[in-house]
């Protein structure tokens, strides 16, 4: 008799639990939210301000896809770093030195020659003809930024156990051998992020098996389609481009040196895919960054770009607040 009574009570408890859950959710299930962070160099600081507003409005993020520095911000966010953590990171880092593989031990020296490479104020500027070719020149190895990313991932909130689970994350790179887009979602996250931001002509490509990978902005700078395939029902996309190029005019007019290449990667991705992707986002956020560019990593500019991002997030506060309610089903 006691045995049957125990089973009966358990069934009642289970039933009440299900009823309570349905009552709390109003019989609706929450859609899966995908976050897309486009590339844009220093301008990606604006995305951090927008992330702050997502957190304030308690918008859950179930999937993340990013390109170039958007992959770095997205990857770290997926590993449990929050917007405040990322803001401190952006404010405290000397990004130009980090990205340029600058040897900080040589900063105080105007001229230094080491292993056949000539440095000015710590920056590699010329390789002698008889120098070891493996030292590289005009092709930054990206060792500093890789080690930096690897250290951040290895001691992330997820790895330390303060955040239970990582958010599923994918980033986009471009295989220069086969001339095609590659989506990276397995293996070393630091390596994947490093591949996604390997600017052609500036950074050494990242080799994974037979793939030779460079910056994903070559093929897909706003990977809305990628996060959809991951399983997102609705997509919030943060686009840092200021030129939309709908008319396809003068496609290579501003390719002038490395600065032009950086601009091209930030402003001239695969045009057809980009124009489709930005219209496929459920919530498309494009902060007005004025004249700030991809290389504006100085402290004053970063502070201003972060503020623009926060102000943009505030402008979208009402939309974000209603977002989940409107999309529940």
What are these regions (language model features)?
Residues 1-4:
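Positively charged n-region of N-terminal signal peptides that target proteins for export
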Residues 6-15:
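Bacterial N-terminal signal peptides
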Residues 20-67, 75-329:
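Patatin-like phospholipase
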């Amino acid at each position: 008799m006691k045995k049957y009574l125990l089973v009966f009570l358990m069934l009642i408890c289970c039933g009440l639990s299900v009823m309570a859950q349905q009552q709390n959710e109003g019989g609706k299930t929450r859609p899966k939210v995908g976050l897309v962070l486009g590339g844009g160099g220093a301008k990606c600081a604006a995305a951090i301000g927008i992330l702050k507003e997502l957190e304030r409005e308690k918008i859950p993020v179930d999937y993340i896809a990013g390109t170039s520095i958007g992959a770095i911000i997205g990857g770290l966010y997926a590993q449990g770093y929050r917007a405040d953590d990322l803001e401190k990171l952006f404010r405290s880092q000397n990004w130009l030195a980090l990205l340029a593989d600058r040897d900080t031990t040589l900063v105080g020296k105007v001229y230094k020659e080491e292993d056949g490479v000539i440095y000015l104020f710590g920056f590699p500027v010329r390789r002698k003809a008889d120098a070891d070719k493996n030292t590289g020149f005009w092709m930054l190895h990206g060792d500093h930024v890789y080690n930096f990313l690897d250290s951040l991932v290895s001691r992330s909130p997820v790895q330390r156990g303060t955040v239970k689970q990582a958010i599923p994350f994918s980033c986009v790179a471009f295989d220069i051998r086969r001339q095609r887009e590659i989506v990276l979602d397995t293996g070393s996250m630091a390596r994947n992020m490093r591949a996604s931001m390997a600017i052609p002509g500036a950074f050494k490509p990242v080799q994974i098996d037979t793939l030779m990978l460079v910056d994903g902005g070559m093929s897909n700078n706003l990977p809305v389609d990628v996060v959809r395939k991951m399983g997102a029902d609705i997509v919030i996309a943060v686009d840092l481009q200021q030129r939309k190029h709908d008319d396809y005019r003068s496609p290579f007019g501003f390719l002038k040196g490395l600065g032009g290449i950086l601009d091209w990667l930030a402003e001239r991705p695969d045009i057809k895919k980009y124009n489709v992707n930005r219209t496929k986002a459920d919530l498309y956020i494009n902060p007005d960054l004025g004249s700030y560019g991809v290389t504006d990593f100085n402290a004053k500019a970063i502070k201003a770009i972060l503020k623009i991002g926060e102000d943009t997030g505030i402008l979208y506060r009402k939309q974000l607040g209603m977002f989940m309610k409107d999309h529940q089903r």
